[in-house]
Design a protein with these regions (language model features):
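Short, solvent-exposed loop/turn segments at the edges of secondary structure
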Residues: 5, 99, 139-141
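Beta-barrel outer-membrane channel/assembly domains of diderm bacteria
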Residues: 19-118, 144-149, 155, 230-244, ...
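Signature for the C-terminal beta-barrel architecture of outer-membrane proteins
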Residues: 21-23, 107-114, 132-253
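Outer-membrane beta-barrel proteins
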Residues: 39-45, 86-89, 123-128, 164-170, ...
Length: 254
């Protein structure tokens, strides 16, 4: 009886080990977020003028996210519906359900990666680039992100080029209203974390291309706005201090 028991146990061990390894190599997660928020606006964003009535409403975010991960590949798809309670009819054939994230990340090695698709860009204190998650809709970008990381250094290069639709001819005139607020973007971000000092530092350079062409003729003209700066943090002995400085360059106001 004992011999049979030990034989069965030994047969099970390889199967258990294989199952555990497979689970670590291939991970699939799914999350659901329902986030209603009631607001009473009595002078929101600007003082309320005399005679104007306050506003009240309930908005809601319903988001479904699915993510797959293994050693060299990570993919995520996330879709959401954002709206105000009562905004849609009870019978609605045209639902407003959009993709807020749809990207794939390929790890070329332990240090280098490329991430392509619709993604959230969140850096430092999120003053320049952030996910804006406090907003009911959040914020996303259609971009290619190339990165390097080691225990002390992180470097990201972000590239984006936006158009309103597929066209055969007509140039690259871009209508920013109701779409992404820029025509193209190139961003470099570097973060350094020291093992010996309580200081961390980040450097950011962003070049934004903004469409300023002729809307009537669709003649495209792009002006560029550069933003550069640093973000520094200090954490030691109960102290937590952070500071940021950014500077913008533009030949002509856009």
């Amino acid at each position: 009886m004992k011999t049979t028991y030990w034989a069965m146990l030994l047969m099970l061990l390889p199967s258990m080990a294989y199952t555990q390894t497979t689970e670590k190599e291939n991970e699939f997660t799914m999350s659901i977020q329902i986030r209603p928020r009631a607001e009473y606006r009595n002078g929101a964003l600007m003082p309320r003028n005399e005679g104007e009535e306050p506003a009240g409403f309930i908005n809601n975010r319903a988001r479904l996210s699915m993510e797959y991960k293994r050693s060299d590949l990570q993919m995520k798809i996330s879709a959401q519906h954002v709206g105000v309670w009562g905004q849609d009819p009870q019978i609605d054939k045209n639902g407003r359900f959009i993709m807020n994230e749809a990207w794939a990340k390929l790890n070329f090695s332990k240090n280098f990666f490329a991430q392509l698709g619709r993604q959230t860009l969140s850096y430092d204190d999120e003053r320049i680039l952030g996910g804006l998650d406090w907003n009911i809709a959040g914020r996303y970008h259609d971009a290619l992100k190339l990165g390097y990381a080691d225990p002390n250094n992180q470097l990201h290069l972000i590239l984006a080029f936006n158009q309103n639709d597929e066209t055969k001819i007509g140039g690259t005139y871009y209508v920013q209203a109701g779409a992404q607020p820029y025509k193209n973007m190139q961003t470099f971000w570097y973060h350094y974390k020291s093992d010996y000092t309580p200081f961390d530092a980040s450097l950011l350079f962003m070049n934004l291309g903004l469409e300023t062409g002729d809307a009537a003729t669709k003649e495209s003209h792009t002006r560029y706005l550069q933003t550069m700066g640093t973000y520094i943090t200090y954490k030691d002995n109960g102290w937590n201090v952070d500071g940021a400085f950014y500077y913008q360059i533009d030949r002509k106001s856009v």
